[in-house]
């Protein structure tokens, strides 16, 4: 909540400093306690930076394009990391990875002056939208709507956390070759880049809400297909469908919150809700497996999580159509 009150350049500087301090400390001692503290410090710093980034981008008036660029960069960096980390680890060990994180953070200090110091719009429930008959209409948006969007983010990331934690094991349990599984996961990540490009086009044509609802529905179907049976065909279908629509949904979730609240207060909370859900989901899925309910039960749980998010966004969309149609179908 400080993101709307404190100079964002100071917040980002604090986050980057924690990242640098945490990664530098990680190289100094192999002691478990020290390493845990230093990784916690680096993680908090990275979270602060990510939250400040999403809050600042929320002020954009073309949020689908803005967050598509953000997700494109994240996916591209993940692909680079998958390629370069084994090389770094093989040559310099785990300390090499920490140094990589440290060096990666240093150049960001040079772009801090580009960050907006403060939100340019008032935080609260008044959203300025354009109507044909009244170009500066003030519309009252209930605070419950962005909060419901955060609940939907949490629910969807239950799916994400559980799926990523157990999809490889589900493939192995179905006697799918490990090389096939690894290849499908890699190419699925590469394929997901196309989602960031398609999201911009769809947002311009249909707005953000309709593609978001369709993507969540498709994710429900994908999980139910995998719950029915796991073989090579359904496995590769689920990997490519999940990888594509995950990025797709992320763009529109952030974009929807940004259209409702340009202050960035709620968008800055998205990384926290994502992280907590991803930490909680494997435990929940593991409990189902502990009681020998099988991987199909995990996929059904994932389908339910996506269905809950779908229902929440459907309600939010209907309310926005009543209150501010331009916001409901904004790109």
Please name every model-derived segment.
Residues 260-294, 302:
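A late C-terminal transmembrane helix in Major Facilitator Superfamily
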Residues 47-61, 247-261:
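Intracellular juxtamembrane helix-capping segments at the cytosolic ends
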Residues 1-8, 195-208, 289-290:
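Helix-to-loop junctions at the C-terminal end of transmembrane segments
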Residues 22, 33-41, 233-241:
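Paired small-residue
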Residues 60, 69-120:
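Helix-loop-helix hairpin linking two adjacent transmembrane segments in secondary transporters
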Residues 206-253:
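C-terminal transmembrane helical hairpin of 12-TM major facilitator-type secondary transporters
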Residues 144-186, 190:
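Extracytoplasmic gate region of multi-pass secondary transporters
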Residues 1-30:
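Conserved MFS/SLC helix-loop-helix module at the cytosolic interface between two early adjacent transmembrane helices
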């Amino acid at each position: 909540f400080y993101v709307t009150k404190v100079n964002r350049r100071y917040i980002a500087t604090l986050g980057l400093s924690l990242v640098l301090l945490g990664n530098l400390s990680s190289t100094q001692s192999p002691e478990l306690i020290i390493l845990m503290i230093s990784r916690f410090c680096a993680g908090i710093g990275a979270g602060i930076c990510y939250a400040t980034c999403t809050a600042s981008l929320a002020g954009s008036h073309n949020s689908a394009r803005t967050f598509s660029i953000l997700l494109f960069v994240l996916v591209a960096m993940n692909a680079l990391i998958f390629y370069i980390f084994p090389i770094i680890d093989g040559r310099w060990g785990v300390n090499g990875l920490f140094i990589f994180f440290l060096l990666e953070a240093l150049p960001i200090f040079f772009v801090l002056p580009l960050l907006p110091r403060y939100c340019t719009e008032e935080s609260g429930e008044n959203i300025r939208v354009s109507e044909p008959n009244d170009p500066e209409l003030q519309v009252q948006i209930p605070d419950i709507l962005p909060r419901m969007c955060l609940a939907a983010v949490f629910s969807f990331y239950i799916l994400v956390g559980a799926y990523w934690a157990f999809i490889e094991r589900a493939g192995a349990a179905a006697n799918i070759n490990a090389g096939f599984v690894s290849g499908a996961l890699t190419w699925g990540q590469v394929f997901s880049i196309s989602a960031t490009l398609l999201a911009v086009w769809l947002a311009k044509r249909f707005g953000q809400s309709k593609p978001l609802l369709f993507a969540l529905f498709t994710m429900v179907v994908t999980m139910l297909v995998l719950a029915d049976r796991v073989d090579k065909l359904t496995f590769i279908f689920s990997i490519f469908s999940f990888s594509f629509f995950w990025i797709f949904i992320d763009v529109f979730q952030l974009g929807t919150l940004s259209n409702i609240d340009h202050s960035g207060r709620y968008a800055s909370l998205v990384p926290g809700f994502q992280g907590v859900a991803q930490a909680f989901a494997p435990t929940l899925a593991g409990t189902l497996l502990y009681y020998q309910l099988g991987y199909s039960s995990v996929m059904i749980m994932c389908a339910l999580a996506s269905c809950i998010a779908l229902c929440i966004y459907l309600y939010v969309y209907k309310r926005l159509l009543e209150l501010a149609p331009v916001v409901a179908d904004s790109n």
